[in-house]
């Protein structure tokens, strides 16, 4: 199979009407988010393919998002956009995920998916997020600390990964 450059498009690219690539694909969940008339018109005149993401890739994305700590920041649509990018990579295509969403970019980086921002600078480092107790500072999994009963907050774990090649 011939390697093709494919741009997987997040809804932000459609809302900004900045998706101007030759080979564009998105998922049905993104199409469902298009509510304004200008974006709907833009979407209808561009040559988008709309395809489902595979359940296997959805699970891979969820696992990666759990590892980075972004799982609670991603919508089902975000997860499926990332999964579609993985599907295209598995087909042997050269993939660029087009999004301004930093959580999507972070998970994409952890999965080795190239990405481009639309209006905002893209991330250059991968971040890991963890829940910690607001009261005692312990790392926890739940929303309430089982030790002291305080609420969880999300904190970034510092690291120096700089792996985006896009």
UniProtKB/Swiss-Prot annotation:
Enzyme class: hydrolase
Single GO MF annotation: magnesium ion binding
One Pfam match: PIN_6
Cofactor binding note of this UniProt entry: Binds 1 zinc ion per subunit.
Keyword Ion transport appears in the UniProt entry: no
Biological-process GO terms, alphabetical: maturation of SSU-rRNA
Superkingdom of this protein's organism: Archaea
Annotated PINc domain residues: 5-106
Residues binding Zn(2+), per UniProt: 133, 136, 145, 148
Binding locations of Mn(2+): 10, 101
Region feature (Flexible linker): 122-127
PANTHER family assigned to the protein according to its UniProt record, in alphabetical order: RNA-BINDING PROTEIN NOB1 (PTHR12814:SF2)
Recorded family membership: Belongs to the PINc/VapC protein family.
The protein's name in its UniProt record: Endoribonuclease Nob1
């Amino acid at each position: 199979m011939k390697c093709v450059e494919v741009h997987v498009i997040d809804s932000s690219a459609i809302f900004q009407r900045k998706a101007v690539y030759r080979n564009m694909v998105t998922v049905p969940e993104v199409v469902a988010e298009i509510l304004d008339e200008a974006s709907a018109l833009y979407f209808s005149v561009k040559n988008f393919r709309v395809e489902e993401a595979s359940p296997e890739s959805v699970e891979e994305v969820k696992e990666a998002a759990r590892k980075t700590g972004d799982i609670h920041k991603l919508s089902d649509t975000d997860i499926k956009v990332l999964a579609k990018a993985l599907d295209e990579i598995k087909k042997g295509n050269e993939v660029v995920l087009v999004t301004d969403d930093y959580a999507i970019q972070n998970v994409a980086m952890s999965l080795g998916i190239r990405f481009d921002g639309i209006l905002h600078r893209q991330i250059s480092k991968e971040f890991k997020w963890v829940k910690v107790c607001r009261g005692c500072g312990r790392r926890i999994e739940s929303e309430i600390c089982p030790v002291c009963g305080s609420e969880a907050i999300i904190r970034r774990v510092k690291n120096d990964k700089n792996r985006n090649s896009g």
